[in-house]
From Swiss-Prot:
Keyword Cell cycle attributed: no
Acidic residues biased stretches: 132-150
Name of the protein described by the UniProt record: Zinc finger protein ztf-7
Organism of origin: Caenorhabditis elegans
Function: Probable transcription factor. Limits the ability to tolerate cold environment or cold-warm stress. In complex with rps-2, mediates the cold-warm shock response by promoting translocation of components of the RNA exosome from the nucleolus to nucleoplasm.
Similarity remark: Belongs to the ZNF277 family.
Amino acid sequence: MSTSGSGGGNTPDLSKENVASSPNANPKKNADTESSGGSKNNRQRRRSNTKGDGSNSRNGSRTNSVSNSKNQSNRKDWTDRKSFSQGGINVKSKSPGDDHKRTRSSNSQSAKRNARDSTRTMSQASNGEGLDYSDEYELDEPFSDSDDEDSRPKKPEKMSLTVARGRIRTLSGTVPVVGYSPRWGGPTMCVSCLEFFDLPEQISGFADHLLKEHKIVVSEMNLIVDPKRYIEHWRQRFAKESIDKIFPRIEPSEGDSYFGETDYYYLMSENVAEDRSLRQRLAMRRLEEALQCQQREREDTSFQLQCIFCRYNARGNRSKIIHHLYMIHHLNLGSPDNLVFVTEYIEHLKEKLHRNECIYCEKIFPDRNTLMDHMRKRNHREVNPKNHYYDKFYIINYLELGKRWLDVLAEDFEDTMPTFQDSDEEEEDNEWCEWQEDNLDADETRVVCLLCDASEDNAQSLLEHMKTTHEFDLLKNVSDDKLNSYQRLRLINYIRKQNYHADCWVCQKTEFENPLALQKHILEHKPLSHLPDASIWDTEENLVPIFGNDHFLWMLESILEENEITCSSDDEGESEERFSKLVLESKSNTVEGVIAEDLPELSELNEDDLNALM
């Protein structure tokens, strides 16, 4: 039983909640207390929560604070005992703020929920191209039962030793960014003086300088892979040994391109073994460097580039953007295995498109829409093969020194030329026939008669069939009635529709049960020398064919066009013959040698002379 003082003393709260939470509570005693003092406890709650005088309010708040502190200590004690009874050892004491923390499972669930929200947001922002997950949480496997498990802590990243960069052994002297080409060449000192030239940009001026100042000619200088390294090598050699002991001295004669410009010159060519070896070594080193750059691009997984035509972002590998340009926009850049420096290549094309310049014919247009229409209609869906700038983006141009891919293809074609040189036209005809046989079924283009179920391979034989079997000369009727192309379409569609509904298109009778009865009836109208009234069939609804495979419509138009061409040519020949006849007739009726001054005056002529002149 509980008692409460009438004064302002502390009143212990023995309500049902606190009794149940007490660790020493007896279930039976709790039940008796609940039954006997329920009404009194209810009054105590109402008294403590009801606004009254100041003393009652203070007493109620003081009572609640005391009960709360006791509840907290009781709960803590009960939790410790429970952990120890379940086998817990060395249970750590919790701080007062830990009572309000969530349980372990709720934390893991909230973490997973945040991870899912983060993943959903990033995946939507990635435009559908791969999922970008947040680095804050580790995603669990789908349908896993790891909700009660703690999230796995990330492993700390180990520090790395700073490794000194070794000497760069590349032809260009630098390691370019992935997707970009190195620069082969640069400022170069002359082989025999202190003047500098920027090679290979100033290679023509450098060649003139060598000829005029030093009487040196370098053969095929434009084919040297790296003129800078080439000149540096020979400048060091000439410092040890004079040029006349290495290269031959030549005096130009008539017919020589240098005749009259100089008395003699030293020719640096591949005829010297050292020169040939140097050129081949430079070419091989450039090929190795290009292949290394290509391998770096293949292994690069951080590739990201936007399409030059749309908003597609290619991520992960360069082949994605190449395949996208070919499959979606039909821009053929070639196979990814033959391409190198792809990022630089595509950025160069993007700059051209920003200037509204066609990538094939390199014409500039006023706006982008005009450029796109031009590239689509002209089928300019590749780069200009005659532009040497694009040679560095294709590995095939690095294989043979001094030969572009067009030259390599031409040599391959010449090697196989004798095998089919005499039968090109026959082979093309055979290939065309084979293509037609493989891709076109002969039954799909057969034309059906307008009066029966017979079919022919072409419209000309079908017209002969209708003319001989049914005595229906369609071409004659069309020419007699002077039907235009639309009227011819309406007529054929009208006949097809009437035959389909088993109605006579000649007399418009509708009493036939099937097409066979209609065919027998049409035989009674032989010969079909005239067409029905145009008001019956010359309507707009007959412009739409009733059958989708009625090839007689377009085949008939082709025959009529050919006849018009032949008729026009015949008319021109007849007009020329008629004109020549008129010219001859006018010449025969012309009196030659008569001058107006020789004619007598009319007043001097009598009636007999006038009659003779008339």
